[in-house]
Curated annotation (Swiss-Prot):
Pfam families: 3Beta_HSD. NAD(+) binds at G51, G52, A53, G54, H55, L56, Y220, K224. Belongs to the 3-beta-HSD family. Pathway: Steroid hormone biosynthesis; dafachronic acid biosynthesis. Hydroxysteroid dehydrogenase involved in the biosynthesis of dafrachonic acids. Catalyzes the dehydrogenation of cholesterol or its derivatives and the isomerization of the double carbon bond on the sterol ring. Modifies sterols into a Delta(4)-3-keto-sterols such as cholest-4-en-3-one, precursor of Delta(4)-dafachronic acid. Contributes to the production of Delta(7)-dafachronic acid in the XXX cells. Dafachronic acids act as ligands and bind directly to the nuclear hormone receptor (NHR) daf-12 suppressing dauer formation and inducing reproductive growth. It comes from Caenorhabditis elegans. PANTHER family: BIFUNCTIONAL POLYMYXIN RESISTANCE PROTEIN ARNA, SHORT CHAIN DEHYDROGENASE_REDUCTASE FAMILY 42E, MEMBER 2. The active site is at K224 (proton donor). This is 3beta-hydroxysteroid dehydrogenase/Delta(5)-Delta(4) isomerase 1. It catalyses: a 3beta-hydroxy-Delta(5)-steroid + NAD(+) = a 3-oxo-Delta(5)-steroid + NADH + H(+); cholesterol + NAD(+) = cholest-5-en-3-one + NADH + H(+); a 3-oxo-Delta(5)-steroid = a 3-oxo-Delta(4)-steroid; cholest-5-en-3-one = cholest-4-en-3-one.
């Protein structure tokens, strides 16, 4: 074999070896890239929500999902652009949903089952009370954040049972804090009510420093006040806590306040307002959207070591509103007149007292409670500067436009704007007659009780 041919073979061999090395390096690079893409993500953020069947919990789950999707979508998009740029638009959302459980897992706890649409591959449901030790200890495993939204006694059988309210709302919360801390939970957010500080006296721009009253309106408020103190004292290095106070939660689809108002408006009897001493009382409600913002931002703030913890924050709408006039745009949108008569506060309060007395005797929920009426008739406005400063809270002014849109799209047209709604004065007559009947009933009851006690005081069987 000639030197020339040997040289050519050697060059071909070197060239083939170089090609193999290049291919091998490219393969290794590709394998390395794939390995980076497919390497396991950090442990997902695990959240536990008590009161998980409620409207607030449902909206909180939706917000946490939205936040997680927004955070991982850019990463998924970047990954898919390298692999399959032609189908990127159809693939991203599907891939985000597929990978969602890798980034967030939610556990809902309640004695009632949530709506089916809430439960997904990353949302689990545990049917139990939050004071069930065995079940809760299991549910709390590997949980990072607890949102404690549940409580009893606002209505229902527990409203008349002080021991049950204290055992569940106060002692139950204390036990939940202990189990959470022992399980490694890092952040604990507790939801409370302005009822814990409202005593029936006017409150103007009240801060979180307002003290607790000597006497509470009901067992619910008393037990929540005790729970607030417990949550504050439990805050420390291992687990940081925050208390959020709400006032009259309302919003599209919310049942306790909003749907009660809508149902009453649809009867056509939303025709009166009340102005004690000639001035309508002012309040600050808490829209669902603002509540969710407060919950999310409180959790995020607790992640930073320089953020105060063990604090109480007022979470309300941005500005005070009239307790009755606030709802007027909704009443008009439902097709009713804007005309209103002004009624005195006394018959409204009498109705609330009678309603609550009858409800307590019959062991049912009152049509309207004394606390609810006083919150309508007495000024109660709150300062939200602390939440704005510490949490970055940026509340909206009102959710009334969203509520109007929600119900106008869901109620049948003949219900929203039926004909023959010009009977305003007939309704006024009915209202006046009802007020007179209440006065007569109260007077008759008082008179007969007086006669009975007089006879008993004179009776001597000996």
């Amino acid at each position: 074999m000639s030197i020339k041919r040997l040289s050519m073979r050697l060059k071909k061999g070197i060239h083939r070896s170089w090609n193999r090395m290049t291919s091998l390096e490219a393969g290794l690079e590709e394998e390395k890239e794939i390995k980076i893409v497919e390497e396991p993500e950090p442990r997902p953020w695990k959240v536990l929500i008590t009161g998980g069947a409620g409207h607030l919990a449902e909206n909180l789950v939706a917000k946490l999902e939205e936040m997680t999707r927004d955070s991982i979508r850019p990463k998924i998009r970047e990954m898919l652009e390298k692999e399959m740029p032609a189908v990127i638009s159809t693939k991203v959302d599907k891939e985000v949903e597929k990978r969602l459980p890798m980034y967030i897992q939610i556990v809902l706890v309640d004695v009632l089952e949530p709506r089916g649409r809430v439960l997904k591959h990353h949302v689990a449901f545990v049917k139990c009370s939050f004071d069930d030790e065995c079940t809760m200890k299991t549910a709390l495993e590997q949980v990072d954040t607890v949102y404690h939204l549940a409580a009893v006694g606002m209505t229902g059988q527990y409203a008349r049972d002080r021991k049950a309210c204290m055992d569940i709302n106060a002692v139950g919360t204390m036990n939940l804090l202990i189990w959470a801390r022992n399980s490694g939970v890092q952040r604990f957010i507790y939801t409370s009510s302005v009822g814990v500080v409202f005593s029936g006296e006017p409150m103007y721009n009240a801060t979180e420093e307002v003290g607790y009253p000597d006497d509470f309106y009901n067992y619910y408020c008393e037990s929540k006040a005790h729970a607030e103190r417990i949550v504050q004292k439990a805050s420390g290095h291992r687990m940081r806590t925050t208390v959020l106070r709400f006032n009259g939660i309302y919003g599209p689809g919310e049942k306790r306040v909003t749907e009660r108002v809508v149902k009453f408006m649809l009867t056509g009897m939303w025709i009166a307002t009340c102005k004690p001493n000639g001035v309508e009382a002012q309040t600050q409600l808490s829209s669902v959207a603002n509540c969710i913002q407060g919950l999310v931002k409180a959790e995020l703030a607790l992640r930073w070591s320089d953020t105060p913890h063990g604090q109480i924050y007022n979470i309300m709408d941005k500005t005070p509103v009239g307790t009755f006039s606030f709802w007027t745009p909704l009443n008009i949108a439902l097709g009713f007149s804007s005309s209103m008569i002004t009624v005195p506060a006394t018959p409204i309060r009498l109705f609330a007292y009678l309603s609550q007395i009858i409800a307590d005797r019959m062991r049912i929920d009152p049509i309207v409670s004394v606390l609810e009426v006083d919150l309508l008739l007495v000024n109660n406005t709150f300062n939200i500067e602390k939440a704005e400063r510490d949490l970055g809270y940026e509340p909206s002014v009102s959710a009334i436009p969203e509520i109007i849109e929600h119900y106008l799209h869901r109620l049948p047209p003949d219900v929203v704007r039926p004909k023959g709604r010009s009977d305003f004065y007939v309704k006024v007559a009915v209202l006046v007659l009802g007020t007179i009947l209440i006065f007569v009933a109260v007077f008759s009851f008082t008179f007969w009780m007086y006669l009975i006690f007089q006879r008993l005081s004179r009776w001597n069987p000996f």
